[in-house]
């Protein structure tokens, strides 16, 4: 729930909050099944959270964020090692009044050693961006994720939450304001990387499986 409300996407606003050690420490003391936790690094308390999760061997990932370079650099130094659904729910290069600023996307590119994942369904990201991620981050630092909902592989005939619609091979908000989730399966991601982004098959399979 520790996400920037401005970048929450289709998350329920009422569940969003800043990290609270009285919540996450008891939880993580009682279980060893959590292997990764995604969080917005600019939130108050996020660095203490990342230090704690790192001490537990849990991957902490940047997500749903407006963080710029200094914030990403500091987050990486603390223990944020990965960017979740790269490009989605995070800004790129942008302008505020007359000045231009790097976004989270450029900041992650500049952070050597930070790994990324992409929703390679050809809808969340176009082939040109998939090529760019592959070129700049490389097969060693990139993985493919479906980010799929429970409706994965459905064709739109299955009744779903009325807030969403299935259209053009993806789940969207009913008002068409945003994508709401993927319907892709892993084979679709590999096929997209090979056929649309012209990535070698062996690298596409590696990014989908390692």
Where are these regions (language model features)?
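Generic structural "secondary-structure junction" signal
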Residues: 4-5, 14, 18, 92-95, ...
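Aromatic/hydrophobic pocket-lining residues that form the small-molecule binding cavity
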Residues: 20, 24, 46, 186
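A polyampholytic, Gly/Pro-enriched intrinsically disordered region
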Residues: 12-17, 84-88, 163-168
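Short, flexible active-site loop motifs that bind/organize anionic cofactors or intermediates
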Residues: 14, 36, 62, 176, ...
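Divalent-metal coordination cores built from histidine and acidic residues
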Residues: 1-32
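Active-site core of metal-dependent hydrolases
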Residues: 25-154
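His/Asp/Glu-enriched, well-ordered alpha-helical/loop segment
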Residues: 100-118, 134-146, 151-210
């Amino acid at each position: 729930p520790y996400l920037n409300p401005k970048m929450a996407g289709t998350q329920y606003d009422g569940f969003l909050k800043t990290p609270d050690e009285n919540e996450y420490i008891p939880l993580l003391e009682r279980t060893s099944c959590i292997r990764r936790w995604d969080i917005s690094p600019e939130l108050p308390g996020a660095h203490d959270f990342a230090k704690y999760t790192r001490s537990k061997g849990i991957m902490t990932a940047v997500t749903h964020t407006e963080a710029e370079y200094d914030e990403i650099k500091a987050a990486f130094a603390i223990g944020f090692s990965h960017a979740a659904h790269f490009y989605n729910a995070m800004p790129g290069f942008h302008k505020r009044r007359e000045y231009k600023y790097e976004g989270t996307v450029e900041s992650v590119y500049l952070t050597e050693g930070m790994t990324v994942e992409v929703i390679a369904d050809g809808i969340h990201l176009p082939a040109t961006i998939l090529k760019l991620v592959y070129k700049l981050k490389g097969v060693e630092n990139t993985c493919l994720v479906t980010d799929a909902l429970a409706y994965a592989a459905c064709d739109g005939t299955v009744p779903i939450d009325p807030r969403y619609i299935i259209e053009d091979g993806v789940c969207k908000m009913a008002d068409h304001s945003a994508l709401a989730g993927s319907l892709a399966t892993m084979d679709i991601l590999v096929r997209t990387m090979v056929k649309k982004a012209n990535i070698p098959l062996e690298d596409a399979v590696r990014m989908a499986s390692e």
